[in-house]
């Protein structure tokens, strides 16, 4: 298997992907708990492009588009009849080994319906779909795949995390970049104190987007708090730093 490129995780700065992801590109995951390298294989890319073709973009509502693609990504990776094995075990059993006996990684298409996909595979899926829609002029906002870090507010426990940022555009959400976290939904409460979950979409100012790109901490505001009367009730999420509170950005 020929490797065209590698999406590597950096310890001291985020990895930002804005170009097309090529067949057999390697996606590095954290090795904590046995998580290995994922292979972005042809079947997986074709599957994501098929999902992109099935997305209804006629009403130009980006939140509806993101909700639709998220539902389809979860249907792809999760199944009631899927495996009960651990992620580590499945990565081991499905591993691709080269002619020298070295493990290259595990095809993401082999994780279909296995109930073990995490943020890196799901965020890569979302990025490929959104990039397809953008390239075909079905959405006007350009996506980027980000490999960085995440922690909860008031916690120093920062872990590797993948998510998607979406460039700002003069549409329903003007002057705002967006951060889409497919792994973590937004828990919200309306003015009647009724709680519910929606896809995790956050608004970013220009400065916050710059912080994300440079690995500085950023605590974005839920988009729903800006465009509706909803209030986010889950713990605030802090993106973009590996060292938590000890890695605050310097004042400019």
Question: Model-predicted segments: where are they?
Answer:
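Gram-negative host-targeted secretion-system effectors, predominantly Type III and Type IV
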Residues: 39-69, 133-142, 164-170, 236-248
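Hydrophobic/aromatic-rich core segments of domains that either
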Residues: 121-217
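Residue-level detector of alpha-helical secondary structure
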Residues: 49-52, 70, 209, 227, ...
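Active-site nucleophilic cysteine motif
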Residues: 65-69, 112-130
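Secondary-structure boundary elements
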Residues: 32-109
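Intrinsically disordered, low-complexity N-terminal segments that are enriched in acidic
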Residues: 1-27
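Non-Sec secretion/translocation targeting segments of pathogen effectors
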Residues: 1-9, 33, 237-252
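Low-complexity, Gly/Ser/Thr/Pro-rich intrinsically disordered linker/tail segments
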Residues: 212-241
């Amino acid at each position: 298997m020929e490797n065209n490129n590698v999406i590597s995780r950096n310890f001291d700065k985020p990895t930002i992907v804005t170009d097309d992801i090529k067949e057999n590109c390697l996606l590095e995951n954290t090795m904590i708990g046995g998580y290995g390298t994922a292979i972005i294989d042809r079947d997986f890319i074709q599957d994501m492009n098929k999902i992109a073709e099935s997305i209804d973009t006629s009403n130009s509502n980006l939140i509806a588009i993101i909700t639709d693609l998220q539902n389809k990504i979860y249907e792809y990776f999760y199944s009631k009849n899927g495996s009960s094995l651990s992620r580590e075990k499945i990565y081991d059993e499905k591993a691709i080994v080269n002619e020298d006996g070295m493990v290259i990684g595990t095809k993401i298409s082999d994780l279909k319906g296995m109930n073990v996909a995490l943020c890196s595979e799901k965020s890569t899926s979302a990025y490929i779909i959104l990039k397809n829609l953008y390239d075909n002029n079905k959405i006007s906002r350009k996506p980027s795949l980000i490999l960085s870090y995440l922690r909860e507010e008031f916690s120093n426990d920062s872990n590797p995390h993948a998510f998607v940022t979406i460039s700002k555009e003069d549409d329903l959400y003007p002057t705002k970049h967006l951060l889409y976290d497919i792994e973590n939904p937004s828990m919200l409460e309306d003015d009647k104190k009724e709680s519910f979950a929606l896809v995790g979409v956050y608004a970013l100012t220009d400065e916050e987007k710059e912080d994300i790109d440079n690995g500085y901490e950023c605590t974005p505001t839920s988009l729903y708090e800006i465009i509706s009367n909803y209030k986010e009730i889950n713990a605030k999420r802090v993106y973009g730093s590996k060292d938590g509170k000890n890695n605050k950005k310097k004042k400019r």
